[in-house]
């Protein structure tokens, strides 16, 4: 009996190999830029702690392809917590590698003085780190990554970074950015925005990158529409969640598929005990289908 034909990048077909703990950059760490809002002592004691930033790279074994799509996954944690080994990030990366992707889960710099300046600086530092991770992955290697098929996704803070990569790379960086020279021969084809936000809807005018978005309509941390992250005006101006982002993207002619969810919590893919939820699998399969459709249209 003939086996059914495999649907490219939708049906698992490969064993997965992992290269763990790959150092992709060396950066000054916690509060490396200092903070005008914090005590002088904290700036002296805590700034410029050197960090080796690491990623875990997942790849299909025995695929034989000379050209693989890349998925860059970024964890959440309010720019304070989290790491590349979070169960959801690992599960997503393993699944996408089994489909034929190279998938990388990255660590990035964390921590900020609790102020608007502090959070903005933490976001900028983390975005610079994500840039560095992309530069590393797209550099000379045996990973066989196709620079025309790059995808970025993340949860919460990681989704903010994914949106920043897709849209800020094509526009102007905020001041003091240290964006690497990535060149012009690559493209982010689509973003998985899992309960993230943008600070300014005008950033969506910088590019034309499709967005797949999931978020609870009653998210207690990131506003579904417009509001204050963590419901704390002291650390941020108002931001725009997935509904506002998708509405503006659609008005600009950008494909945006929004999946509002009824759960009364922020993190949808894992429960309080750290176990994957049924929603994780829904997101995983929706993301695979969304990305595959973009590849069929050549991004």
Located regions from the model:
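The feature captures the conserved acid-bearing segment of alpha/beta-hydrolase catalytic domains
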Residues: 178-252
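Alpha/beta-hydrolase-fold catalytic nucleophile elbow
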Residues: 107, 153, 192-195, 214-215, ...
């Amino acid at each position: 009996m003939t086996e059914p034909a495999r649907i490219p990048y939708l049906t698992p077909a490969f064993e997965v190999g992992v290269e763990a703990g790959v150092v992709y950059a060396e950066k000054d760490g916690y509060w490396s830029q200092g903070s005008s809002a914090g005590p002088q002592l904290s700036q002296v004691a805590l700034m410029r702690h050197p960090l080796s930033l690491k990623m875990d790279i997942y790849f299909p074994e025995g695929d034989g392809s000379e050209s693989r799509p890349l998925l860059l996954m970024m964890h959440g944690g309010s720019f304070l917590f989290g790491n590349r080994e979070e169960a959801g990030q690992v599960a997503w990366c393993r699944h996408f590698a089994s489909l034929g992707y190279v998938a990388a889960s990255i660590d990035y710099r964390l921590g900020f003085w609790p102020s608007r300046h502090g959070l903005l600086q933490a976001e900028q530092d983390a975005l610079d780190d994500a840039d560095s991770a992309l530069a590393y992955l797209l550099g000379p290697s045996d990973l066989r990554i196709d620079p025309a098929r790059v995808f970025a996704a993340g949860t919460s803070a990681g989704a903010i970074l994914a949106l920043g990569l897709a849209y800020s790379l094509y526009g102007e960086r905020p001041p003091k950015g240290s964006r690497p020279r990535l060149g012009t021969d690559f493209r982010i084809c689509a973003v998985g925005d899992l309960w993230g936000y943008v600070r300014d809807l005008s950033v969506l005018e910088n590019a034309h990158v499709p967005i797949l978005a999931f978020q609870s309509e009653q998210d207690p941390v990131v506003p579904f529409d417009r509001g204050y992250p963590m419901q704390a005006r002291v650390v941020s101006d108002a931001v725009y969640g997935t509904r506002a982002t998708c509405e503006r993207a659609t008005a600009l002619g950008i494909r945006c598929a929004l999946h509002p969810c009824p759960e009364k919590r922020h993190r949808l893919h894992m429960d309080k005990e750290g176990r994957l939820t049924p929603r994780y699998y829904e997101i995983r399969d929706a993301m695979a289908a969304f990305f595959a459709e973009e590849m069929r249209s050549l991004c």
